[in-house]
């Protein structure tokens, strides 16, 4: 869990947006956090980054005020629910909507998935009610075939919640997070048809339509991090971000 030793607020002056990745993504997939923030800043340079626990209401409000009260870009349904319930005055938008708006997507992916989305509950407001459609659009824009949710699906589950991905994988179900597809990295690479730099969509304007360069063997899946590894991930993530930005 993010605490005072692993918290970070990056941004100067009045920012239009602030990316709030949340504990689960930072602990489990720190490289995706870096990639996501980089792709957001590439589109809008006045995008800040806030690595705080969403439950630290006072710290979140202080950071939000310091950055000029930006719109918060969320990728975690649990964070969205908390913001909607405890911080309803802070404007939020889902990361998946912003990725679609900016035209950011990953490379070719012809895998079949069972869509398993988390809405975040009643407190999440519109951020993830609207963002749910963007998850499907992102996957389909990469060539994935989506199937309705069902128990014990023969296809790997595609989720928008890292905690749900971990729970499914721990129960011996195949599962991947949508950001693993977009950025071509993560603990579920066994389902990625090819691996190449998905950093910015402008570098892949043809979206691999010819299939050239998209062949290859998927990498074996990485094990889910244990508690010590998750803590180390947080500490290393903060260090890397401070060096980069």
Predicted features and spans:
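Iron-sulfur cluster-binding electron-transfer modules in prokaryotic oxidoreductases
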Residues: 1-245
